[in-house]
Amino acid sequence: MSDSEEDEEEEEASEVILSSVVQKKKKKNLRFGEEVERRDGLVLLAQSTPMVRSRSQGTTRRVTPTPLVDVEKPLPNGDLYIGSFSGGFPHGSGKYLWKDGCMYEGDWKRGKASGKGKFSWPSGATYEGEFKSGRMEGFGTFTGADGDTYRGTWVADRKHGHGQKRYANGDFYEGTWRRNLQDGRGRYVWRNGNQYTGEWRSGVISGKGLLVWPNGNRYEGLWENGIPKGNGVFTWSDGSSCVGAWNESNIMRSFFNGVEKNDLIVGNRKRSSVDSGAGSLGGEKVFPRICIWESDGEAGDITCDIIDNVEASMIYRDRISVDRDGFRQFKKNPCWFNGEAKKPGQTISKGHKKYDLMLNLQLGIRYSVGKHASIVRDLKQTDFDPKEKFWTRFPPEGTKTTPPHQSVDFRWKDYCPLVFRRLRELFQVDPAKYMLAICGNDALRELSSPGKSGSFFYLTQDDRFMIKTVKKSEVKVLLRMLPSYYKHVCQYENSLVTRFYGVHCVKPVGGQKTRFIVMGNLFCSEYRIQRRFDLKGSSHGRSTAKPEGEIDETTTLKDLDLNFSFRLQRNWYQELMKQIKRDCEFLEAERIMDYSLLVGVHFRDDNTGEKMGLSPFVLRSGRIDSYQNEKFMRGCRFLEAELQDMDRILAGRKPSIRLGANMPAKAERMARRSDFDQYSSGGASYPSHGEMYEVVLYFGVIDILQDYDITKKIEHAYKSLQADPASISAVDPKLYSKRFRDFISRIFIEEG
């Protein structure tokens, strides 16, 4: 053999291609929120090695490149690949169509989507941009099926780096992202004009930041987990401000919970548009699958667990649990109602004769709450002194301590402010919720007085608080009994007597004084109140003057109009009787009479409305009463635990059931009598049909500021000439208390 022939044989041997062993690995679906592991050999591709070492020769040889060919390759599983192929896998430009409708079209490199490309989902969602090693990585734009759009940088299928997201509801975020969450500095603009600029951590506002409302209100300071915490300043549009070191339990948390209706609620969603943590999705959602070809003999396959439209909306928008802190707390107040129910009262807008009075009241309460918020000490006996009152002047141009305003010059008086601040704390009324419900952008509603006192009633738009104008004599009674009242409500947390939150007085320059008290609204409820009764236990004049056809849900009915008795569980019935006895003894000791039990009834059976001529029963959230779909609840005893379970289903939260609020009961239809013998005999009235209704009750003792003075004594003497002395309201407090308790024990019945 010649030397040239030997050289040719060696050259041929050195050009032998040594193929790598292809080991097929099990596909690994990565769920949202898990760490993405990229390890050598996770998916081993059949590919040529550019440089190999010959074992026999010990020298490095170059591998002959595999040529590119264009193919249309149907796969056994129904998928289809069209494009360039090299070495048994996609390489170059190509299109892969999955049988479920997903499609990738773009660049491939050694079996992996790499370079520029576009991925489409059957739902209409798309990603167009850069890919690397089978993943969305680099710069790209994701458009969700619902219209959400993210444009920015990606790392391993996640938003990471700088990017901007436009939400389908009109919201917008631009800033830094980390693992699909806002993290670092960013700006979020709500569709209603609210804007936050500042720091984020793990998808939640945390750090230094500024939140600005369209009306000019603003908060600038420190945040933690979506709420103000630390040093910060809340500034109103009129220039007044509140400065302090805020924490979760004090005023600033509720500055933001209290303005959710107009300011921070995002669309009609239960969750914010703001992206959040990658919580567990219960094993139902999967991470976008990796676009990598796995060669197995003649066949090939690309794993396609790409998200569909539902998953896209979950993964790219709504992963937040509503129970976590942060902006998810800015949801609708349970007392709001957006349905078709008639809201009582007339909104006090500009031009209303009480408009200036409302502005004065709002300015005064805002000033009072802010002024006394920083005072931290125990109450002293002098704090209860009726002379403990403070006058403050509010000129339109403002002073060092009062803001400028558009109303008339007026003076403002606060009675025993530290005592009422402590009472609000006792009744768990957050200072800022209190302030913003009364002093926020929403106007108050004026109600006509259902009684003969001539008082005016004002209701906040969220229905949480009631404001009543009162006489000077009533203010004196309240201030006189304030020490005993404070002791009583401290001792009995389930007391049914009216919850007082403040006593104030407004006097315009050259005008008359208007005294008013602020109270809790008994009927602040998630449920519509279809019947309301004002019950004293007397009969003389105790019926409504309205004809039957004009009675609606806003009508306050009286004793002779009552045509129900209410059945309570044994433990609730016993607690009610005990508390009524305690409250009546307290009022009797204070020489108070002429009070009432105000009762509100929500009928849970959707058929009750047709029988009683009521409008359709709607939850105060505006939805049709979902209890109609819960047949298993009907006919049972409606134990409080069951009611709580149902409300968790309906509203996503556990309701607060206490004596006088959210109480499950049964209402038995009784015959309405024109006389009062049904109550004077000591027994219950006779049922007309024995009809039973499942209800939720709200009740409390109201009008507790009337003492048995000379006026009431004269009224008693005069009316005794016309009617049975035992049937009139104006009687001695001791007799009134006994009659009231006997009456309550007859209309409320222990469930056997």
From Swiss-Prot:
Key word Transferase present: yes
EC number(s) given by UniProt: 2.7.1.68
Source domain of life: Eukaryota
Induction cue: By abscisic acid (ABA), drought and salt treatment.
Database matches in CDD domains: PIPKc_AtPIP5K_like
GO molecular function, one term: ATP binding
Keywords assigned: ATP-binding, Kinase, Nucleotide-binding, Phosphoprotein, Repeat, Stress response, Transferase
A cellular component annotation (GO) from this entry: plasma membrane
Tissues expressing the protein: Expressed in the whole plant, preferentially in roots. Strongly expressed in meristematic tissues, namely procambial cell layers.
Start and end residues of each stretch annotated as Activation loop: 708-729
GO biological process per UniProt: phosphatidylinositol metabolic process
Catalytic activity reported: a 1,2-diacyl-sn-glycero-3-phospho-(1D-myo-inositol 4-phosphate) + ATP = a 1,2-diacyl-sn-glycero-3-phospho-(1D-myo-inositol-4,5-bisphosphate) + ADP + H(+)
Modifications made to the protein after synthesis: Phosphorylation inactivates the enzyme.
Residue ranges annotated for the PIPK domain, each copy included: 349-748
InterPro entries (alphabetical): MORN, PIno-4-P-5_kinase_pln, PInositol-4-P-4/5-kinase_C_sf, PInositol-4-P-4/5-kinase_core, PInositol-4-P-5-kinase_N, PInositol-4/5-P-5/4-kinase
Presence of the UniProt keyword rRNA-binding in the record: no
Function of the molecule: Catalyzes the synthesis of phosphatidylinositol 4,5-bisphosphate and phosphatidylinositol 3,4-bisphosphate.
Protein name per the record: Phosphatidylinositol 4-phosphate 5-kinase 1
Organism name: Arabidopsis thaliana
